[in-house]
Amino acid sequence: MRIGHGYDVHRFCDGDFITLGGVRIPHKYGLLAHSDGDVLLHALSDALLGAAALGDIGKHFPDTDPQFKGADSRALLRHVVGIVKAKGWKVGNVDATIVAQAPKMAPHIETMRQLIAEDLQVELDQVNVKATTTEKLGFTGREEGIAVHSVALLLPA
């Protein structure tokens, strides 16, 4: 059994939506990123790669590589799952915490869980996503960006 932790942050920029957990969410800002900016899926990918001792998403999908410009983070996550499975692991469960003052995540969390479970090829009860604020403290509290912490448990396949 292996445990990995993932963390990612993206700054807000001009835009009218963000993508989190594969869900397009209307917002007064977008997220600045080389890919689609899905900070949740990036943190989950890092947790999975970390648990399997396979580095991080920057190693596998460098932001200096033009082929990943605007990349769909769901496709990247599915690729990570393939790498992890090829090393003899399967997902036991994942848990993620979105840290954001806005937008409100509650209306979108179940859809995020469903899409993540689909991409990880696991049951819904193996995926947890929750959200919190920092009570208007720090960069997330000032609505400068979004952060996500995630944990993944891998089991021998």
Curated annotation (Swiss-Prot):
Binding positions (4-CDP-2-C-methyl-D-erythritol 2-phosphate): 8-10, 34-35, 56-58, 61-65, 100-106, 132-135, 139, 142
SUPFAM superfamilies on file: IpsF-like
Coiled coil region boundaries: none
Tagged with keyword Iron: no
UniProt superkingdom: Bacteria
The EC number(s) this enzyme carries: 4.6.1.12
InterPro entries on file: MECDP_synthase, MECDP_synthase_CS, MECDP_synthase_sf
GO biological process: isopentenyl diphosphate biosynthetic process, methylerythritol 4-phosphate pathway; terpenoid biosynthetic process
Catalyzed reactions: 4-CDP-2-C-methyl-D-erythritol 2-phosphate = 2-C-methyl-D-erythritol 2,4-cyclic diphosphate + CMP
Record flagged with keyword Lyase: yes
GO terms of molecular function: 2-C-methyl-D-erythritol 2,4-cyclodiphosphate synthase activity; metal ion binding
Binding residues annotated for a divalent metal cation, in chain numbering: 8, 10, 42
Pathway recorded for this protein: Isoprenoid biosynthesis; isopentenyl diphosphate biosynthesis via DXP pathway; isopentenyl diphosphate from 1-deoxy-D-xylulose 5-phosphate: step 4/6
Keywords linked to the UniProt accession: Isoprene biosynthesis, Lyase, Metal-binding
Main EC class the enzyme belongs to: lyase
Site positions per UniProt: Transition state stabilizer: 34, 133
Cofactor(s) this protein requires: a divalent metal cation
Cofactor note: Binds 1 divalent metal cation per subunit.
Similarity comment: family membership: Belongs to the IspF family.
Role, per record: Involved in the biosynthesis of isopentenyl diphosphate (IPP) and dimethylallyl diphosphate (DMAPP), two major building blocks of isoprenoid compounds. Catalyzes the conversion of 4-diphosphocytidyl-2-C-methyl-D-erythritol 2-phosphate (CDP-ME2P) to 2-C-methyl-D-erythritol 2,4-cyclodiphosphate (ME-CPP) with a corresponding release of cytidine 5-monophosphate (CMP).
Assembly information from the UniProt record: Homotrimer.
Name of the protein this chain belongs to: 2-C-methyl-D-erythritol 2,4-cyclodiphosphate synthase
Natural source organism: Pseudomonas putida (strain ATCC 47054 / DSM 6125 / CFBP 8728 / NCIMB 11950 / KT2440)
